[in-house]
Amino acid sequence: EVRTESATQEIHEVEFELKSGSVQSLLAFSFEWVKKYQLWLDVRSKAEFGALLVANKKVSPATMAKETIFNKKESADQNLRGLIANHLQHLLPNIAAISAQVAEDEHVQQAQLALHHLHLSLSLLGDWTDQKVDKWAHQLSAFESHFKNLQHFEHMQRTLGALLQNPKTAESLDKDILYAK
């Protein structure tokens, strides 16, 4: 629970901490919990929730992309991993806001941009690593397509919804030759 003098927000969390072993083992373990208990992973911290509560806001501003600088002293694989990490730092906070159903338009746009950059990076630079990235690239392409559809759907809801709720629209359609009875 996070509280201020005038407000309270419940937080239910299970925290997974890597004390030893590989990151892959921790992720595999946490994903089993996600599936088994219908949990979802969230990158937002209790401190962020507290700051939002104090500011009387529901969501932090959308996270923007940061410039990636390649290090010529590192291997191509290490540079690609840094690039992917940068894209994920751009993507995950925006996805968290969308998943929590508190996102603003900018969160959706930035998530779509991050997905696009991540997909392009894996597609164009995937041969920089020995890891199999084809499956990731394919899944990201499908996810990216989903976001484009979501954006189109939301746009249609806003524009067509307002148009159809306007009383003059029905009147105009009755007068229109194509729709006249």
Predicted regions and their residues:
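Function-determining surface determinants
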Residues: E1-K181
